[in-house]
């Protein structure tokens, strides 16, 4: 019906790792997620860090697991306390972030391509509002458990990643935005 039901500031991809425009269907919410480090980040950031400091993985709460590096769930996990998966070939998803100060900036292109959500708890509440098991209390527990928990959505939710430099607000006024790319 065109009514906005949720709004949040986001952080998107840097100019070197732009967030791509595409659509998908949100199928899962993952609380206290592991972060499986993508090969590009592993090669460009993690491996050089390991070469400089043999304790790099331990200092960043990371481990080798099944031939790849992953970051364990926790307070400083790069995905924060929850991620929202809509399977796609771009390996892009919505997620929380431990770096909260970026949401207050006018320009917020700081990620490797995923979309960091400024109000992840509120998004989880909205996405799971029709599932009686997922009360606000249970969402809070899952987000803070430190133990990964996958929740399959009963009804998939269409997600459209768009990029607009002009937008018409509820009053019919056109707002123009800086082109971050």
Task: Give, region by region, the residue ranges found by the protein language model.
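Well-ordered beta-sheet/strand-loop patches within structured domains
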Residues: 1-181
